[in-house]
A protein has these predicted regions:
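GST-like fold's C-terminal all-alpha helical module
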Residues: 125-261
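A short, terminal or domain-edge coil/loop segment
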Residues: 105-115, 161-170, 184, 188, ...
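GST-like domain detector, emphasizing the conserved glutathione-binding G-site
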Residues: 1-173, 299-311
Length: 311
């Protein structure tokens, strides 16, 4: 099968061409910090699939390897993860997971309940703000902004210039450039970023309360069977942990607290999230925790989260 340079319009699902000469049946181009990469890594672990991991730095984790010529040959959209099966690329994480589920049926729980909660925990649409009432994933994406600021502040302006010029999504590139230039001041009182974060948190409270109620007398979202929905919420809850928000929910929602405890004790949590951590992620989360106490507008933002009771 001949190699072919993919076109942007083709980049959904499995393609018929190859983009690599790897001897490995499965290859995953991923990033340690990316939520979508974490989801696919966990799926591969739960399916017990041997794969070759190829780490690609994105600007949050100190570099722009996703904008390199070599990676753009793999994915012109410059996004991770990309899963290769026999060197044929599968684009978009939800399509990669669907492909795994179709290739290895009945290994993870499947039901209407799984579909509902998996979608509820996903980032849906091109504009996260428009979906915050329906999708917890959209809320968590917007609440990750303070962590982005913490992780990006040591990235050189030269790299940011390169990032802005080359990144195919100018909206994302502009937002991240603002994080680097303005720092936590993007969360000043009544600023657009502050208002969006507060709205996202208000809607996330409703999603978390609903999940807590659903988990009554259940081990996993679909009862006794671990599923893709649990993988989705594993990554979301851990991201809330990274942004110093998860305890607001687990201190008051007992079912959610016990559920997160079970998720953290699963082998795939340790092997696919914790063991794939890095100094950049560690220092970013550590600095954010410290900055919440030291930076007045950031402290005010987090105080507003904590002062609003759960529904």
């Amino acid at each position: 099968m001949k190699k072919k340079n993919p076109k942007n319009k083709d980049l959904i699902g499995k393609q018929k061409y190859t983009v690599s000469d790897s001897n490995s049946e499965w290859v995953l181009y991923h990033n340690n910090f990316s939520l979508c990469s974490r989801k696919v890594r966990i799926c591969l672990e739960e399916y017990k699939i041997d794969y070759l991991p190829v780490h690609i730095h994105i600007i949050e984790t100190k570099d722009c390897e996703n904008l390199s010529k070599d990676f753009l040959k793999i994915n012109p959209k410059a996004t991770v993860p990309v899963l290769l099966h026999n060197n044929q690329p599968i684009y978009e994480s939800h399509e990669q997971i669907r492909y795994l589920m179709e290739t290895f049926p009945n290994k993870l729980g499947e039901s209407e309940t799984v579909d509902y909660w998996n979608t509820k925990g996903s980032l849906v649409g091109d504009d996260p703000v428009s979906g915050i009432k329906d999708y917890a994933g959209n809320c968590v994406s917007l609440l990750t902004q303070p962590l982005f600021v913490s992780m990006l502040r040591k990235i050189s302006f030269f790299k940011f210039f390169n990032y802005f010029i080359k990144h195919p999504s100018k909206f994302r590139a502009l937002n991240f450039t603002l994080y680097r230039l303005l720092g936590y001041s993007v969360f000043n009182k009544n600023s657009p970023h502050q208002r969006v974060a507060i709205k996202a948190f208000e809607n996330l409270k409703s999603h978390m309360t609903s999940l807590d109620g659903h988990l009554e007398n259940k081990i996993w979202i679909d009862g006794d069977k671990f599923s893709i929905a649990d993988i989705t919420w594993m990554t979301l809850l851990h991201r809330l942990d990274e942004v110093n928000l998860v305890e607001i929910f687990t201190e008051k929602l007992n079912n959610l607290r016990d559920y997160y405890f079970r998720l953290k004790n699963r082998e795939s949590f340790s092997s696919c999230i914790i063991e794939f951590s890095s100094e950049t992620i560690y220092s970013g989360t550590k600095n954010l925790r410290e900055d919440i106490q030291k930076v007045s507008n950031l402290r005010q933002l987090y105080n507003s989260f904590e002062s609003n009771p759960l529904p």
